[in-house]
Swiss-Prot record:
Family affiliation: Belongs to the spermidine/spermine synthase family.
Name recorded for this polypeptide: Polyamine aminopropyltransferase
Keywords attached to this entry: Cytoplasm, Polyamine biosynthesis, Spermidine biosynthesis, Transferase
UniProt: S-methyl-5'-thioadenosine binding residues: 31, 106, 137-138, 162
Organism for this UniProt entry: Bacillus mycoides (strain KBAB4)
GO cellular component, one term: cytosol
EC class: transferase
Keyword check for Lipid metabolism: no
Pathway: Amine and polyamine biosynthesis; spermidine biosynthesis; spermidine from putrescine: step 1/1
Catalytic machinery residues: 155
Role, per record: Catalyzes the irreversible transfer of a propylamine group from the amino donor S-adenosylmethioninamine (decarboxy-AdoMet) to putrescine (1,4-diaminobutane) to yield spermidine.
InterPro entries (alphabetical): PABS, PABS_CS, SAM-dependent_MTases_sf, Spermi_synthase, Spermidine_synt_N, Spermidine_synt_N_sf
Length: 275
C-alpha cells in the first residue's frame, strides 16, 4: 500500500508527495508537527498540514532569505532570525565572516528539537558558538529590542496560528525600532498566485515605515505555486545598489551575485501588486 501526503494549498488545489514513512508526529503547544520521509524530497517538516522545508529544496528559501540582505548591508555583525526553528537561515547567515552573533527566536521548541534529529544538514548550525537560541515569542522579543540588530530576518509560517502577529504593521514598526540606523529586514511574503492581497498589504505597510522597500522572488517547488516572494525593508542601503566588491565568495546552490539583482525583476502581474 502506498502512503501519500497532500497539502491543500487552496480549497481546490494542492501538492502531493509519496511518503516512505512517518518519522514523528505530535500536537505541540502551538501547532501540529509532522516529520516524514518522502520518496522525492527526502525528509520533510510539515506544520499544521503545510510543508515548511524539505532536504531537497530547502537551500533555495534559506539562501534567498539570508544572502540578499546580508550582501546588501556593508558590515552585518549582529543578526536576528525570528522563527526559522529548522536552522536553515542561521546556517546561511553564518557563512558571512562579518557576523559575530546570530540570535534565533523560535516560539515552538519542538520544531528545533525534531529538526536537529531529522534534518541535521539544515539544523546543525544551531549549535555554533556564535548562535544564541531562544525559545519564545518573536513578536515580544522585537517589542523589547531597540537599536540592536544590523539585519532582522522573519522566517515565519503562513499568517495563521502563532505567526499571525508577524504580518502586522505594528510588528514592522517594532522591527524598525529594533534595527540600528542603517538596518535591514526581510520577511517571506507568500506567493502571488493564491495570496496576492497579502503581498500588496505587507508591501504597503513596510513601505510606510522603511524608505527603501522592494520585493523579490525565488522558485521553490514544494511551496504553494512554486513562486515565492520576499519583502525587504531598508533604512539606508538599497539591495539594487550593492557594489561589486561587496560580494565575497560563499558556498551556495541557488544564490549568486547575478541572481541577487535578477530576483528583483518581477513578472508584470507581480509588479502590479505593489504599484
Amino acid at each position: 500500500m502506498e502512503l501519500w501526503f497532500t497539502e491543500k494549498q487552496t480549497k481546490h488545489f494542492g501538492i502531493t508527495a509519496r511518503i516512505n514513512r512517518t518519522l514523528h508526529t505530535e500536537q505541540t503547544e502551538f501547532q501540529k508537527l509532522d516529520m516524514v520521509e518522502t520518496e522525492e524530497f527526502g525528509n520533510m517538516l510539515i506544520l499544521d498540514g503545510m510543508v515548511m522545508t524539505t532536504e531537497k529544496d530547502e537551500f533555495v528559501y534559506h539562501e534567498m532569505v539570508a544572502h540578499v540582505p546580508l550582501f546588501t548591508h556593508p558590515n552585518p555583525e549582529n543578526v536576528l532570525v525570528v522563527g526559522g526553528g529548522d536552522g536553515g537561515v542561521i546556517r546561511e547567515v553564518l557563512k558571512h565572516p562579518s557576523v559575530k552573533k546570530a540570535t534565533l527566536v523560535e516560539i515552538d521548541g519542538k520544531v528545533i528539537e525534531y529538526s536537529k534529529q531529522y534534518l541535521p544538514s539544515i539544523a546543525g548550525a544551531l549549535d555554533d558558538e556564535r548562535v544564541e537560541v531562544k525559545v519564545g515569542d518573536g513578536f515580544l522579543h522585537i517589542a523589547e529590542s531597540e537599536n540592536e540588530y544590523d539585519v532582522i530576518m522573519v522566517d515565519s509560517t503562513e499568517p495563521v496560528g502563532p505567526a499571525v502577529n508577524l504580518f502586522t504593521k505594528g510588528f514592522y514598526a517594532g522591527i524598525s525600532k529594533a534595527l540600528k540606523e542603517d538596518g535591514i529586514f526581510v520577511a517571506q511574503t507568500d506567493n502571488p498566485w493564491f495570496t496576492p492581497e497579502l503581498i500588496t498589504t505587507v508591501f504597503k505597510d513596510v513601505k510606510e515605515i522603511f524608505p527603501i522597500t522592494r520585493l523579490y522572488t525565488a522558485n521553490i517547488p514544494t511551496y504553494p505555486s512554486g513562486l515565492w516572494t520576499f519583502t525587504i525593508g531598508s533604512k539606508k542601503h538599497d539591495p539594487l545598489e550593492v557594489s561589486e566588491e561587496r560580494f565575497h565568495e560563499i558556498e551556495t546552490k541557488y544564490y549568486t551575485k547575478e541572481l541577487h539583482n535578477a530576483a528583483f525583476a518581477l513578472p508584470k502581474f507581480v509588479g502590479d501588486l505593489i504599484k
